[in-house]
């Protein structure tokens, strides 16, 4: 089993069915359903995901999708310590700094999946695009 931290953009791709990105994102969630991956997302992602989903879904539909998401993933806490580290980090994007510092708190994490790999250049964790992660998971399943 692989332990994967998903950046917010990947979750939005999946839930909002943003083509062409949703295909790889859906495959990642399928690996989770099959027990081949455990997916982590940060708690702070929920408000960002809700905001984006509300642009194309009713509030009730967006809440339903977030509830389903909570059943498919592990949610990492965003603590004061994570915020402080993120504020002092070398990351250019504050939200990415929060995501990264949340991932660092996990005892088991194989990689972070994001479409914004350039924003994670300072990462000490492995960073993959959704397509790279899908390829790795497909090859490790054989």
Model-found features: residue ranges?
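Active-site-proximal, substrate-binding regions of enzyme catalytic domains
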Residues: 26, 44-82
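Short loop/helix-cap segments at secondary-structure boundaries that form the rim of catalytic
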Residues: 118-125
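Short, well-structured N-terminal submotif of metal-dependent ribonuclease cores
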Residues: 1-41, 54-61, 122, 132-142
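Active-site neighborhoods of divalent-metal-dependent phosphate/nucleic-acid chemistry enzymes
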Residues: 74-117
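A short, flexible beta-alpha/helix-coil linker loop
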Residues: 11-12, 46, 83, 119
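Hydrophobic helix-cap positions at the C-terminus of alpha-helices
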Residues: 31-32, 69, 106
